[in-house]
């Protein structure tokens, strides 16, 4: 049953990421999505459906890895530092 919850959440998260990426240019959309997902993970401390599933499907490590492969090192640094800071901020809101 846990796998079903994660799979359902991942599908919903991926659809949400796709919809947002249609509204905003790709690199900026990806950064915003990853920052938002990190913040929500820290703030809500979600269960399997919403954490591992939805937020795992919503955020994108593969697109981040592709940008790294293409040499976007500043973008990668901003993403890593920004996502850690967003998670810490969300965690502070949860406390």
Swiss-Prot record:
Query: What does its activity-regulation comment describe?
Result: Na(+) is not transported, but it plays an essential structural role and its presence is essential for fluoride channel function.
Keyword Cell membrane applies: yes
A GO term, aspect molecular function: metal ion binding
* Pfam assignment, any one: CRCB
Keywords of the record, alphabetical order, are: Cell membrane, Ion channel, Ion transport, Membrane, Metal-binding, Sodium, Transmembrane, Transmembrane helix, Transport
Q: What is its main location?
A: membrane
Q: Localized where?
A: Cell membrane
Gene Ontology terms: biological process? cellular detoxification of fluoride
Indicate how the chain sits in the lipid bilayer: Multi-pass membrane protein
**A single GO CC term, please?**
plasma membrane
Q: Which reaction does it catalyse?
A: fluoride(in) = fluoride(out)
User: According to its UniProt entry, what is the function of this protein?
Assistant: Fluoride-specific ion channel. Important for reducing fluoride concentration in the cell, thus reducing its toxicity.
- Tell me the protein's name: Fluoride-specific ion channel FluC 1
């Amino acid at each position: 049953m846990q796998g079903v919850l994660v799979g359902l959440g991942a599908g919903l998260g991926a659809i949400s990421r796709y919809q947002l990426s249609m509204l905003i240019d790709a690199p900026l959309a990806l950064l915003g999505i990853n920052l938002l997902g990190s913040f929500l993970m820290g703030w809500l401390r979600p269960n399997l459906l919403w954490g591992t599933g939805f937020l795992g499907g919503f955020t994108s490590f593969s697109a981040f890895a592709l940008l790294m492969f293409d040499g976007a090192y500043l973008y990668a640094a901003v993403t890593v530092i920004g996502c850690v800071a967003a998670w810490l901020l969300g965690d502070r809101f949860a406390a």
